[in-house]
Amino acid sequence: MKNLFILLFLTIFICIPVIGCASDVKEHDVDIDFSDLSMTMIQAEYQRILSNSEDYMGKTIKMNGTYYSFQIDEAGNIAHFVIIIPGDDCCQMGFEFKRGENYVYPADYPAQNAMIQVTGTLDKHEQFGAVYIYIDVDEFSVISE
């Protein structure tokens, strides 16, 4: 009987914290939130991702920055980027992002140099004989034009 009481007590003791934490789980958990880091930490995390990109594939990234796009080939395909520009204008960092085929350029994109927020999953693609990493967008918003 004493063993049963101990087992019941431990079960309740272990389950209560787990049940209590369930309400803290967010629908869109972000693994790396660049929008909430200092510039030093942004640079460090960005370098870690570039150096070990395979470790970050499938991770959710949130990033605020400047929107930039340009035509990448003669077919007229456009690449879209979110760029972080440090205060001293040195060492700009950013990622290409893709919103999906339902979004048409330029109608569904902001003007060049608009401040944007991108949240999505890190992925990779091969183009022009090289492998590139990009953010597969789940959420996109314009902070300011």
Residue ranges and their predicted role:
Residues 6, 19-145:
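OB-fold and OB-like single-stranded nucleic-acid-recognition modules
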Residues 1-5:
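Positively charged n-region of N-terminal signal peptides that target proteins for export
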